[in-house]
Amino acid sequence: MNRIVSRLSALGKVWLGLAAGALALIVFGLAAPGSGLFFPLLSLWCNAALFALALLVLRRAGVELDLFHKAVLVGVWAVAALYFFWALGSRTFLYYWDYVNYILKQYNAEAAFAQSTGAGFRFLLDSITEDYTNFIPLFTEFPFCLSGKTGDDYAFCQLFSVLPSLLVLLAGLVCKAGQLLRVKNTRWYFLIGFSWCVTFPFLRMSAMLGQPDWFGLIFAFMLLLLTLDYRFDRIDLPRYLLIFAATAGVILTRRWYLYFVVGYCFAYVLLLVVSSVRLAKSGQQSRAVRRLVRLAVFGLCAAGAMVLLLLPMVRKILGFDYAGRYSYYNFGGITLELAAQALRIGLLNFILIGLGLWFAAKRRLPALPCLAGVELLTSLLLFTRVQNTGSHQMLLFVPGWLLLFLTGSAALAEGIRKHRKLKLFYWAFTLVFAMSVRCSPLTTVALPGFAVDHFPLKAVSEFVRLDKLTYDRTDAAQIQRVDDWIDAHCDAEKGEFAYMIPHDMLYNSDMFQYAALPDIQLQGKLAAGISIPGTHEFPVRFFEAKYVLTAEPFPQTFVSGGELSGRWNALFCAARDEHFTQAASFDMGNGTVFTVWERTEPADRAEVEYYLDAFAQEDALYPEMFSQVAESWLAGHGL
């Protein structure tokens, strides 16, 4: 046995250790179901397996990281740790909506595994059709389980659960792109390219806000590494399995990564077809045909297997009207999206991209920038058929933009001797600028925090004010006072709760419920308001609530015309004296005053119809979310 082990490579020994660990986990899970140690140990094993998979992908892709690369990796991780520690510690951010979803999923996953091992795995698998799957929580439990389990802790722990594998694969991608671009000055190229990519603000943006969606980039980078220089000239079964696994992984992370997968596959197939046509014209017809046949066979088999593997998700996608339900988020289609992309990328990055395009044209190396450009355009066109992107959805375009950045980095590195000081200043200034960008829910243009706070145009003064309020809260004490009042006046055992009308980035029910994570003080005592057509149902809980909370001025932070909470609030204010009396008010210290209204008369059909009639347009589009919900509630209450 010792002789067999000694013959294994270092990576082989790692996989042998992982197999032994998996066997030990199985035995432990069967012997001690419900143990509080099982889920953290499972998460630790998954992270180790993912890191080993990353190393295996690098080897299959023909990329070897030497001591120089490893030293840069360790240094970058250390800088990232300091950055996260400083950035998270210098703000007071309240996690809500999408920013709290994964944290709550982590709590729920822990609770499920605390019941039993089987219950935990069922919880993970049952989410496959949801917008947020439980795939990421499987990896983020360790070391989150060792922390105070606050929102900031969850963001910081991604340094250990996400960043190591991500950095290793990004380093490999930088090297692979350098091979394709035939870079000679490899060390300068790696320093510039790797640092440029890793400091790109929208790489870390969602992670800083408690959304570990950048986890999907681990699998996206795997896919790029395995395919960028592979042309199906020979059959490579291990590579095919890794490509399939990477594709499944990126889709399981977040469903909208499918737009990247489709866009990249289209661009890759187009590249392969063009290269095969060129081969055929050069007299290598048989080689070109073999390429295309292998591509077609692999593509069909992989697509069929993927549909079977993700059949529940496929059924959900085919049976759900995403364009209709998410129309609220479609602000202006492809035209507005191109403008948004330009603002997010910024002038400094576009200068680099321009240098890269000039470099690729001069060296007659069009494949990489063309592949990236086609992937970006295809993904943009597909995504904007449903909606426009938020800052976290920018992640699905990151692989394409990074390939363009790397092409520009090659141009800088190869010509570093000319205008050396100017180029080094440009590089250093861009890194400092990128690291200073504020990662806020309202970030539209990638600007440092000091630039946002002192932006000279009066036209954006309201944006600056709201950005400050939402990113670094100054009203945490006031929010806690509201929480304490609701907690004291609502008895959950009697079914008493409050309903909050505001549903906005400035104020919403999530901020009050999750203001002191991991403690959820108002569990079952605060209901959320209606806001997004196609997403939120007619709020029948409003008619059951003991108290209703609203605010003056009513929060409406850059909402679209179809937003519903403002309309509901206007209806409430016009008729509240018939059913409510004022119970309390709270000055939030920033110009907003919350008022609590206590219901004095039980809801009747006339009151329900008063609100329902005001949403006739929404009812015509989504009757199952409005009139059917209202009628069902009325029937259930004998009205």
Residue ranges of model-derived segments:
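Signature aromatic-anchored transmembrane alpha helix within multi-pass, membrane-resident enzymes
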Residues: 9, 70-74, 191, 241-245, ...
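Membrane-proximal lumenal/periplasmic loop motifs of glycosylation machinery
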Residues: 89-100, 114-138, 157-160, 342
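Transmembrane-helix motifs of polytopic, lipid-linked glycan transferases
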Residues: 55-58, 156-184, 222, 354-361
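Short acidic/glycine- and proline-prone juxtamembrane loop motifs at membrane-interface regions
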Residues: 202-215
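Start-transfer (signal-anchor) and selected internal transmembrane alpha helices
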Residues: 1-86, 290-300
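Transmembrane-lumen/periplasm boundary regions of multi-pass, lipid-linked membrane glycan transferases
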Residues: 102, 108-109, 260-261, 265-271, ...
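Membrane-interface alpha helices of multi-pass inner-membrane proteins
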Residues: 239-255, 266, 380-381
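Membrane-embedded, lumen/periplasm-facing catalytic core of multi-pass transferases
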Residues: 430-505, 616-619, 623-638
